[in-house]
Curated annotation (Swiss-Prot):
The gene is HACD1. Its EC number is 4.2.1.134. Residues 1-36, 93-102, 142-164, 231-249 are cytoplasmic. The active site is at residues 171, 178. This is Very-long-chain (3R)-3-hydroxyacyl-CoA dehydratase 1. The chain crosses the membrane at residues 37-56, 76-92, 103-120, 127-141, 165-182, 213-230.
């Protein structure tokens, strides 16, 4: 499930286990991390802007969404796969976001791009694909712009406002688009048995991709409200200065 809840891309290097390291080296590591993260976020902002322009240009020229995915798929695949670096950033400690949170966010996008839309060509012209592509594109332009300006210590209020308001509409739209796309893929997956492992085989294991997709769709039911309301709490905290008290489970 696409989510933009993490707010940790601040360029701060982790100092866990580095208590005896010279302060000068820690500062250099922090500077290097900040430079790299600034470059990364500028590149990702530019990439999603290119994607947005390509989508608008295609629709203006063709007047239809059919063929849109095919026309932008290389750019989409490159920049979405490039986002795997965000997991690496967490692993090496240059951002304070949880590895699990980053992993879920990035892997859900990779799953939709490579294992659904890329692999099941008959669904590429579905309107639901355009739905999540538009939601992702606006979300990512806003998110990476927010990170870039934050790293540069010059965050325009509009970018901050957009970061914590656009998701109110875009997040549900993206989720609906993803769910409808997976649903559209089900008949093809069931008919072809793609990615499924049948018994008997020498490993004595089985896997049914069709039922895996059903379980994936069902997982949105508990996850979406949890993530959405977390983001709403973050919005109140950042934009309105409310103190949010998290209840212990």
């Amino acid at each position: 499930m696409a989510s933009s809840e993490e707010d940790g891309t601040n360029g701060g290097a982790s100092e866990a286990g580095e208590e005896k390291e010279a302060p000068g080296r820690r500062r250099r590591l922090g500077l290097l991390a900040t430079v790299w993260l600034t470059f990364y976020n500028i590149a990702m902002t530019a990439g999603w802007l290119v994607l947005a322009i390509a989508m608008v240009r295609f629709y203006m020229e063709k007047g239809t969404h059919k063929g849109l995915y095919k026309s932008i798929q290389k750019t989409l695949k490159f920049f979405q796969t490039f986002a795997l670096l965000e997991i690496v950033h967490c692993l090496i400690g240059i951002v304070p976001t949880s590895v699990i949170v980053a992993g879920v966010q990035v892997s859900s996008r990779i799953f939709m791009v490579w294992l659904i839309t890329h692999s099941i060509k008959p669904i590429q012209n579905e309107e639901s694909v355009v739905l999540f592509l538009v939601a992702w594109t606006v979300t990512e332009i806003t998110r990476y712009s927010f990170y870039t300006f934050s790293l540069l210590d010059h965050l325009p209020y509009f970018i901050k406002w957009a970061r914590y308001n656009f998701f109110i509409i875009l997040y549900p739209v993206g989720v609906v688009g993803e769910l409808l796309t997976i649903y559209a893929a089900l008949p093809y997956v069931k008919k072809t048995g793609m990615f499924s492992i049948r018994l008997p085989n020498k490993y004595n294991v089985s896997f049914d991709y069709y039922y895996f997709l059903l379980i994936t769709m069902a997982s949105y039911i508990p996850l979406f409200p949890q993530l959405y309301f977390h983001m709403l709490r973050q919005r109140r905290k950042v934009l309105h200065g409310e103190v949010i008290v998290e209840k212990d489970d």
